[in-house]
Amino acid sequence: MKNKAAEVGEKVGKTGKATGAKGKSSGKKKGEKRTKQKQPRRAAQKYNPYICPDGMSLEDWQRALRCQAAMRDDHLAVQAPDKAGDPFKVVNIKKQTEHLVEYYGPKSEYNVCSCLDFKTSGLGTCKHIEAIGIAADGRYARKRYAKPSENKLYIDYVEGRRIRLMSRGENGESIKRLSLDYGFDEEGYVLEREGIHEKIVEFIAKARDIDPGFVTTDETLDIIITLRQNKARKKVLEDKYTSSSLDGLLKASLYPYQREGIKFGFEHGRVLIADEMGLGKTIQGIGVAELLMREGFVNNVLVVCPTSLKYQWKREIERFSGKDAEIVEGNLMQRRKIYGFDVPYRICSYNSMLHDVKGGTDIKADLIIYDEVQRLKNWDTQIAKAARSLKSDYVVALSGTPLENKITELYSVMELVDQYALAPYYKFIADTTERDATGRVVGYRNLNHIAERLAPYLIRRRKKDVALQMPPRTDKTLFVPMTKEQMEIHSENQFTVARLIEKWRRTMFLSEKDRKKLLMSLSIMRMVCDSTFVLDQRSRHDTKIAETMHIIDEMISNGDEKVVIFSQWERMLRIMAQSLDKEKIGYRFLHGGVPSAKRPELIEDFLENPQCRVFLSTDAGST
């Protein structure tokens, strides 16, 4: 075997052999002439990553794709182990990533890689395992590590992430016999049954009595701990919390569906709350965090959200929980310091999180709340990759639209919640999409099966579903007459609209010029209903401002109510602001020209300043 120095940087060539390997002697005798003949090279078959070849199983096709990827990736380098028992290392020189591989030869059932693809695909291989076989021709594994010879409890990812016993070491037969009394079958797999995690813990202790070197992998311990925590949380809900007993959890009254969402998040631990906008996903996320803290399952929470929502999250956390929340901001060193603060809540933006991950900051949290998680719907973006690198025991993802266009977006979002929820990816795509001969997606199928798989992870309610649980909303439409000048402009454009619509009805066609004229006339009719000032900024004929001021005067004189006014037209709000100035009524004005950094300050002042009674906003304030 080559020493480590000789192995480092041994790249995978596209021919499938390690570069720099010594060739064999030709066997030619001295002085003998021999014609050098080129041996024909067998071209490797190329596989389409979108279309499974006829006569080939889905799994075999995926294994072939991983072998093909290993052959084509010139940035992979294989490092052989220094001694028997140590893993191989496969380094991506370009991405500066490293994966550990236990390699025992081509197609060995004992091969294991630390990468996510190996753990989720169920194929028993990955690009890194194939790279070792190509780069070294498998010679290291076949000669020195034919089969493992140890007793250990590990995760079999090929059989669906099941706990399995390997009993190939000294006293292995004794350990195997012992395992049959603790819920294992003849093949070494743990049988699914109630309370099995407790029996596994007891088995590990007795197995170590037989073999002090008995190994339990970290992944196995993680699963055992997760099973124990799941059972503990479920028991807490059954023993201590009814639907009404959550009322004192937050400094706010909760609707029944919100209590249901909090209990769902607490019980399942890693969830996506996908309620429609306006149903209070934020308060449910905070409620899950508070319940987990109260029962001792978490100590700290990290909220990752869009930049514009950082201060809103801070206000809501402090308002509903009464606890401190620190916003992660400043330069890299300042942000790194804030991550280490001993506070219950920390809040960072998606962009800051990306820079901190790339900068090497070790971001840790017991619970991570991802707000507006649909922003991570594109799997291959840097922000999505950085978010997937964050580790936590609990996750609450919030989104009103977890699926917008493509079904792959849902898979990307669910990887943040639980990377095994919909895995493996290739099977998910094969089961849910219809493709044409070119591999283009032309339809979807089996969507009901996705809903079944997501049941332990996703809860979604629509407004119509919970309407009876919510207080009635009072909608009141006030009709305001237009002035003579407004009516003249409105009628003129109304005539143009009527003429063009009649033309379309006769010919079923409008030219591009007529279409633009139609849209322009409709817009003018809408604008002039507010004020002629919105059109020309010279004249001002309107009645709506006076009526609005009358309503504002009536509301603020009878209590401490505050008023929010939306308008599509900034010019209309400018007139409104002039009237408020004249009456000396405090207000804040949010429009598209206000920098994002200053918007939280405007909202904060409106909410907290008793002298600020009115908030004016264009469409910019609705996001």
Predicted regions and their residues:
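Conserved nucleic-acid-binding Ia/Ib motif block in the N-terminal RecA-like helicase ATPase lobe
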Residues: 304-347, 589
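Conserved helicase motor
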Residues: 308, 327-335, 349-355, 375-381, ...
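Conserved Helicase C-terminal RecA-like lobe
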Residues: 286-289, 293-302, 360, 468-495, ...
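Conserved SF1/SF2 helicase motif Ia
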Residues: 272, 276-279, 284-315, 394, ...
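Conserved P-loop NTPase motor "coupling/switch" region that bridges the ATPase
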Residues: 297-300, 314-315, 319-322, 342, ...
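Short Cys/His-based metal-binding microdomains
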Residues: 94-148
